[in-house]
């Protein structure tokens, strides 16, 4: 077990703050305090690992933990959150109190999962012997524990769902970036959504940092931590406490590699990273979204122009879990109906924050992500795919009935050299990978290349070969990739399946 700083403090108030112990008499809590040890676990450190013997129960006083199960391929699968006020390791401890080998003595059993601190956390530990002694003297403690275990069993698989992030770290990559004004604009946009938020630039008051952050979370819907990347205590603390990290950089700047040190803790896999590129004014500057995504190990890239406006509102909706993602299915000519869906959403004043799809649905989604208005989308789709036949360059059918040059030229004419990371909003297209039998999600690279892959109807258009893999129409394996959109963002998903 990796711990930091064992402490001997009055644990009765801490135990009384745990919800499932709130009805337990104070004398029982005082007895529990005599059997307990109070210590801290820094973010990313293990409380215990899978396979280690269990002889204690832990109570989370502040912070949070994540349970992870080791998979055969070496990955760690996230099993669920353990929040402040909940016990950890109770199942293994109770099971270990049974005589398994028949020698008349209770046996320890190994933990079946690893538990890591997701934030700087404080924990109370009570040994099995101490808990048994305590339960015999104060049965109400055991009754409370049984009620909690039964409640967890009723929850079943619901526990493995990730909780919505509440603490966001906005990390400037340069001291010349002033986040204050933009953070205030973001706070105003969140307020319009009915979301209470707090901007924090340092730990305030005399509380311990873990208790300070717990209080912030209880009092606010969203907490925004502002820091500048570098070797300073506040930056390191905000990185440990954040649920999601936003790397804020100038759009015309070049990243260094890597931005963050490599971490071996599976807890780091839950600290999802986004890149936020700042533009001055409405003009889009040449930027390097792919470089920033690689340098930060980021999942998404966003652009922010004017301090207040559509981009700020989109970020606020994304943070609040109120973003809107549209996903369009393939369907050949029927996919033109997606244009009507886009028009209807806009007429109703429903914003579109994410766009994606498969086959021709991805082409329409790409038009939306380019930032074109309704008339522009209709004009370009009509010109590129209706007024002339893009499949008219017939070929000896070796890999396709047509050569595909016309389609390539249409895509180049309308989408040019636009990179997916340069688009107005996060975008994806789905293609089918014939090499490994799975579908591929395109979220980086040339937009027209991703669209060419997702519309490569087998037997009609030649496939796209990318990095030695053969890609064809996304509709073959995932014609309506609503599941991909669900993974991309936490807000609403509007799907159109034709």
Question: Where is each model-derived feature located?
Answer:
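Cyclic nucleotide-binding regulatory module and flanking cytosolic helices
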Residues: 2-43, 83, 92-99, 137, ...
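Cyclic nucleotide-binding regulatory domains
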Residues: 20, 43-120
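A small-molecule sensor/coupling module
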Residues: 11, 29, 102-105, 109-118, ...
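Short beta-strand-centered segment that lines the nucleotide-binding/catalytic pocket of NTP-utilizing
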Residues: 192-205
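Glycine-rich phosphate-binding P-loop
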Residues: 164-192
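Helix-enriched interaction subdomains in cytosolic or periplasmic regions
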Residues: 122-148, 282-306
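Gly/Ala-rich beta-loop-alpha elbow adjacent to hydrolase catalytic centers
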Residues: 357, 361
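Patatin-like phospholipase
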Residues: 210-222, 230-356, 366-498
